[in-house]
Amino acid sequence: MATAGRTSPGKKRSAPRAETAAGKSSAQPASPKAASPPDPELKAQATRVVRRLKADYPDAKCALAHDTPFQLLVATILSAQCTDVRVNIVTPELFRRWPGPREMAAAPVAQLEKAIQSTGFFHNKAKNIKACSQGLVDLHGGEVPRDLDQLVALAGVGRKTANVVLGTEFGMATGVVVDTHVARLSKRLALTKNTDAVKIEKDLMQLLPKKEWVDFSHRMIFHGRQVCIARKPKCALCSMNIFCPKIGVEN
């Protein structure tokens, strides 16, 4: 959903580890494995974080513009290594031309590539949204399934994308969305020591009440964009400054 930042000219961008622009990582498990009970201190830290985020961002929600579950599914696939702002610029025309899975499944790949080129990794993304649309038509009657395993079986859909769609559109807490911001903030706040998105998600699922999973991600993303930015975070403005250990933050 969020980009890790711009890269210098001539420097190659690497795709996300857990869910790439090309789709799911072949090593990505269907769901995080159960872990031993978390440390009470970590649970207390998570409780503090949830409380402050609720106060700061009570109305936080998914920033990807959409009218249907299908549109959110496609927009989330496009958001890999791309900002939500850019995706929201691209999708109105994309969905005007191909509003549903049947129309998108029939679209020529070359036309899809041209329509989404500015989102990056457009060759793979175009193939994925076309194949995903075809899968929805063939397997689910053109409807987005309300099932995690069925979603991640579709082309280009990993746990992050599935969690976004299920949580945002259907109110189903199937996991914690871990994007660039959630991963960065979780490490800085000492909620995880992991760098892999699936492992971070497992840690957060252990620490957070299930009822908080969906909103927690939205609020962390808002905070990561506005305050706890990647470089030179605005710690003096942060409501969590007093209890944040600032792991990895350089003075």
Regions inferred by a protein language model and the residue ranges of each:
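Polybasic, lysine-enriched low-complexity intrinsically disordered terminal tails
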Residues: 1-40, 250
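Catalytic cores of DNA base-excision repair glycosylases
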Residues: 34-251
